[in-house]
């Protein structure tokens, strides 16, 4: 009932405005964007013909539309509309909207798996970095750049930007933002083989995680400790996962860690069972890791045919 009244209110205030004056509508949309992006989409849908808008209003429309779609997890298919916003705001002194336009253009092409263009657009969003005072926006921007570098396996640069994101989220006392960034820094430190640093960031992430997110960090810490042959600590975090709410989508990756623990502690039958289960995962990374450890089991048994078969599947 409350949501219906809210949408009615949006239509009401829209009706009070003439088609030639949209600034009030856009300002209201910006104010409610963080909490009600779905309502922003409803509000924007009341604008009849976007092509009749002024250049500025059209740029604002496409910026708000792209931002609201991004915040409601709608799949981006083209950057042609947000390009109208970047083209307009790049000619202005509106630092905040210029940065946002480039950021959301980067988000769109990031969705389209075009990493070089995404990187270019994200960095353009930072062209007036020192003048941007919106820490929530800066935190998201830095984090997006960090994630992009992570996917490209440029881990040192990823950590650099993720630490900047962390600073922003700390300034805002944003526990959710801090928990995700700390976890991601932990992952990149693991990739850099800086295990002590990885443990530090993972354990710090646990301080900010909600109960549902902790099981994922516990699992990653368990896997890390197994990699450095600290089986007692690995088991400690495995037990923490078992005592936490476990999402069905996490079963494959958790069973892989469990199988890896049994393989490393020579509990062969259990290792075969859990690694075999995780080798059927829909995630290629989990599949490959499971086949690698199944190959090691066969190598230990000197079953060279089984070793070769699993090694081929791993590679």
Spans of model-derived segments:
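Sec-dependent signal peptide recognition
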Residues: 2-10
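C-terminal motif of bacterial Sec signal peptides marking the signal peptidase cleavage site
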Residues: 15-18
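Residues that mark the junctions of alpha-helical repeat units in TPR/alpha-solenoid scaffolds
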Residues: 21, 53-60, 77, 91, ...
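Hydrophobic positions within repeat-based interaction scaffolds
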Residues: 23-50, 55, 76-79, 119, ...
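Amphipathic alpha-helical segments of tetratricopeptide repeats
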Residues: 45-50, 83-93, 124-133, 163-174, ...
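Inter-repeat boundary and helix-capping residues of tandem alpha-helical solenoids
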Residues: 55-58, 75, 95, 115, ...
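TPR/Sel1-like alpha-solenoid repeat signature
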Residues: 62-68, 81, 98-109, 121, ...
């Amino acid at each position: 009932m409350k949501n219906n009244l809210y949408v009615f209110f949006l239509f009401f205030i829209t009706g009070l405005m003439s088609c030639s004056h949209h600034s009030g509508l856009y300002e209201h949309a910006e104010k409610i964007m963080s909490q009600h992006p779905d309502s922003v989409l409803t509000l924007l849908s009341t604008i009849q013909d976007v092509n009749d808008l002024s250049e500025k209003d059209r740029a604002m429309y496409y910026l708000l539309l792209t931002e609201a779609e991004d915040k409601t997890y709608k799949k981006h298919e083209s950057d042609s509309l947000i390009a109208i916003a970047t083209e307009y705001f790049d000619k202005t002194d509106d630092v905040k909207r210029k940065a946002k336009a480039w950021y959301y253009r980067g988000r769109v092409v990031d969705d389209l798996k075009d990493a070089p263009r995404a990187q270019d657009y994200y960095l353009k969003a930072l062209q007036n970095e020192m003048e941007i005072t919106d820490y929530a926006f800066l935190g998201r921007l830095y984090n997006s750049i960090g994630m992009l570098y992570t996917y490209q396996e440029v881990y040192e640069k990823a950590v650099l930007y993720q630490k900047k994101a962390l600073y922003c989220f700390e300034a805002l006392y944003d526990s959710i933002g801090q928990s995700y960034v700390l976890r991601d820094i932990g992952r990149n430190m693991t990739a850099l083989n800086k295990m002590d640093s990885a443990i530090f960031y993972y354990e710090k992430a646990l301080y900010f995680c909600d109960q549902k997110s902790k099981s994922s960090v516990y699992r990653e810490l368990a896997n890390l400790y197994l990699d450095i042959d600290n089986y007692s600590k690995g088991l400690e975090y495995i037990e923490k996962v078992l005592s936490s709410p476990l999402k069905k989508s996490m079963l494959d990756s958790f069973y892989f860690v469990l199988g890896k623990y049994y393989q490393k502690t020579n509990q062969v039958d259990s290792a075969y069972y859990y690694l075999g289960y995780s080798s059927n995962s829909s995630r290629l990374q989990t599949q490959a890791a499971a086949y690698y450890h199944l190959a090691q089991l066969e190598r230990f048994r000197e079953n060279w045919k089984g070793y070769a078969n699993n090694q081929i599947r791993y590679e």
